[in-house]
A protein has these predicted regions:
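Exported/periplasmic ABC-transporter solute-binding proteins
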Residues: 25-78, 82-270
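Bacterial N-terminal signal peptides that target proteins for export
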Residues: 1-11
Length: 270
């Protein structure tokens, strides 16, 4: 009888071990895929690292620009699209946008440029060609070189909407990423550009706009007027994968606010 009991106990232990191993094997660690805004790189990167450390699930990021990210999620090529502009009415028919943070769009010049402040009206006049020389706004006698983003960029959409310059900007160069804009302006003493506050580097100088500097505080209180949302885009009426839903919920949690702040943006929760 004792021998039989010992055999049954051994069988039970083996069975429980097998169930435990099977349970571990069933844990879904498939990555969460994101695609879109290049301005959101630091925010998504910081959130992704924190989420991976917490859950053991990787978050991938494809920096294609807001328009491409919206298209990618619409076509089912990623779990979550990333946009640095609000969804347009036609996009809202099949997609849902959820604001995760706010971001200032900084007006940037080369550090050698003596100009330190512009009004929104002056910025609009510069980008539409009414003001063409830096001397007209207190700078050097030099032609202003206009740097901007490509069509479909959320940063461009936000900038042009706020300054009222849609379809009127006379860009010298239209670049495909925030990083390219910053690099180009840093290398040209006569250039002006716009870039995400969250992505700024000390290789360029951020101007005050109407006397207000672009900071987390001025974006949050609304006194810095050139700002836009960072948006998580999902397909309306479709359920996210379990892992994508976990990341989505984490990104919107009070816990995530510290990581968004670290990345240079302004959290809407927490």
């Amino acid at each position: 009888m004792k021998k039989m009991t010992k055999v049954l106990t051994t069988v039970l232990v083996i069975a429980l071990a097998a169930l435990t191993l099977a349970g571990c094997a069933r844990k879904d660690t498939s990555p969460v895929t994101t695609d879109g805004s290049t301005s959101m790189e630091k925010v998504i990167g910081t959130l992704g690292e924190a989420f991976t450390e917490k859950e053991g699930i990787n978050v991938t990021y494809n920096p294609t620009g807001s328009g491409s990210g919206i298209q990618a999620v619409s076509e089912g090529r990623c779990d979550i699209g990333l946009s640095s502009r609000a969804l347009k009415d036609d996009e809202k028919a099949t997609l849902t946008g959820t604001v995760v943070a706010l971001d200032g769009i900084a007006m940037i010049v080369n550090p050698e440029n003596p100009v330190s402040d512009l009004t929104v009206e002056q910025i609009a006049d510069i980008y539409t060609g009414k003001i063409t020389n830096w001397s007209e706004v207190g700078g050097n006698d030099a032609e202003i070189v206009l740097i901007g983003r490509e069509a479909g960029s959320g940063t461009r959409d936000g900038f042009e909407s706020i300054t009222g310059t849609e379809d009127a900007c006379q860009y010298r160069q239209e670049l495909t990423s925030t990083g390219d804009v910053i690099t180009t302006v840093s290398q040209n003493p006569d250039a002006i550009g716009y870039a995400s506050l969250a992505a700024l580097k000390d290789t360029v100088k951020a101007l005050t706009v109407g006397g207000v500097a672009p900071t987390e505080e001025t974006v949050k209180d609304g006194s810095y007027v050139i700002q836009r949302p960072f948006v998580l885009v999902t397909r309306t009426g479709e359920t996210l994968s379990a892992n994508a839903q976990k990341f989505f919920d984490f990104a919107l949690s009070a816990e995530a606010a510290q990581y968004i702040t670290t990345a240079g943006a302004v959290p809407v929760n927490g």
